Amino acid sequence: MENTELIKSKAFNVIEVIEYIPNSVVIRSIIKRITGNISAISFDSGELLHGKISPFETFIQIIEGNAEVVIDDKPIFLKTGQSIIIPAHTRTTIKANEKFKMLSTFIKSGYEEVS
């Protein structure tokens, strides 16, 4: 699936804008700006994004399935409908013990300490 923004002023079901691809993590931009972005992300079972440290806080919402989010070596298990705010400057790993979809949102204020 192409990584382009969705059509503005047209209703959509966020779960349907991204599909699962075997052995992959798929990212689809919903809104992408210099000041931040919103993305739909699908994880196939067994996939992970690890060791990421962001200078920005990130809001994660699980929209289908269950996920494991590890923040500074502390595992947190999220199920459909649950959300978490990942603090800036923390090491984060997102694990798919089963396939799942999520929304990821971050907004840059311009005052973050970027190292």
Regions found by a protein language model. Give the residues of each.
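A short, N-terminal "cap"/entry segment at the start of jelly-roll beta-barrel domains
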Residues: 1-35
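Conserved short histidine dyad/triad with adjacent acidic residue
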Residues: 24, 37-54
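Short, conserved beta-strand element in jelly-roll/cupin
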Residues: 42-44, 54-69
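Short beta-strand His + acidic residue motifs that chelate non-heme Fe in jelly-roll/DSBH
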Residues: 49-51, 69-70, 86, 91-97
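A cytosolic small-molecule/anion-sensing beta-strand core signal
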Residues: 63-64, 79-80, 98
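Short acidic-glycine-tyrosine-enriched beta hairpin
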Residues: 73-88
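Ligand-binding loop in jelly-roll beta-barrel domains
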Residues: 88-112
